[in-house]
């Protein structure tokens, strides 16, 4: 079941999914409306008797801001990137725990672990999602439910391309670039794995270490990006 706000793209996605899963479908929902997203998940679970896998991929932001972030814009980013996926988890987890089976993957960002200039709202929202997912994973793992935080590297999605074309971000090095197919294949392989993190690229793992070991050099490099 695909969920997104643009029906035309959802329709195309559903057609592709039906090639391998004939019963695939879609629902239109804007995740900025958290209550509507929760209601949708409840209806899907009621209609299909269960939700075994939830992939929270939707996101907004990721561009370098030149103007000050307002409380309203910060809240809007947090609603889509953190509140909606967290509410989605809380909606489907009771059923997963009763059945002692389930997996949830939440799309984070390397900016959550190593935030750069001009994107504090995006980085904060992804950091909140990563932290909340890890904390909750300890509670549900004994019930056979596994939660994952996905760090995809840089992917040429619409949002990723916008960030480098007019969003103020330099093209990331080749070592951290990944395709949508590479990331999705990795996530599918790792769903249900005991490991919390799903890292598509190894290089970003060095950033938090550099920040601790050589903080001055690290901050200088981040400020230049």
What are the roles of these predicted feature ranges?
Residues 57-62:
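Conserved NAD(P)H cofactor-binding loop of Rossmann-fold oxidoreductase domains
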Residues 1-12:
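Conserved glycine-rich Rossmann-like NAD(P)H-binding loop of the short-chain dehydrogenase/reductase
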Residues 109:
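Residue(s) in the substrate-gating loop at a strand-loop-helix junction
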Residues 149, 170-207:
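C-terminal helical subdomain
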Residues 89, 125:
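Active-site helix of classical SDR
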Residues 28-39, 71:
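The beta1-alpha1 cofactor-binding region of Rossmann-like NAD(H)/NADP(H)-dependent oxidoreductases
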Residues 65-66, 70-75:
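Substrate-binding pocket helix/loop in short-chain dehydrogenase/reductase
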């Amino acid at each position: 079941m695909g969920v997104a706000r643009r029906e035309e793209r959802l329709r195309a996605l559903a057609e592709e999914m039906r090639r391998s899963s004939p019963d695939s479908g879609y629902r239109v929902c804007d995740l900025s409306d958290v209550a509507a997203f929760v209601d949708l998940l409840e209806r899907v679970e009621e209609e299909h008797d269960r939700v075994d896998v939830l992939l929270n991929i939707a996101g907004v932001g990721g561009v370098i801001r030149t103007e000050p972030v307002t409380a309203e814009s910060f809240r809007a980013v947090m609603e889509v990137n953190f509140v909606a996926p967290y509410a989605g988890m809380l909606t489907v987890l009771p059923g997963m725990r009763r059945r002692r089976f389930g997996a949830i993957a939440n799309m984070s960002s390397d900016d959550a672990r190593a935030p750069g200039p001009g994107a504090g709202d995006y980085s904060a929202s992804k950091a909140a999602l990563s932290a909340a997912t890890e904390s909750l994973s300890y509670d549900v793992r004994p019930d056979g439910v596994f939660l994952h935080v996905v760090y995809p590297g840089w992917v040429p999605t619409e949002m990723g391309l916008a960030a480098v074309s007019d969003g103020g971000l330099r093209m990331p090095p080749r070592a951290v670039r990944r395709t949508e197919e590479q990331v999705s294949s990795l996530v599918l392989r790792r769903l249900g794995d005991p490991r919390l993190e799903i890292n598509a690229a190894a290089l970003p793992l060095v950033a938090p270490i550099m920040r601790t070991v050589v903080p001055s050099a690290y901050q200088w490099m981040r400020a230049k990006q």
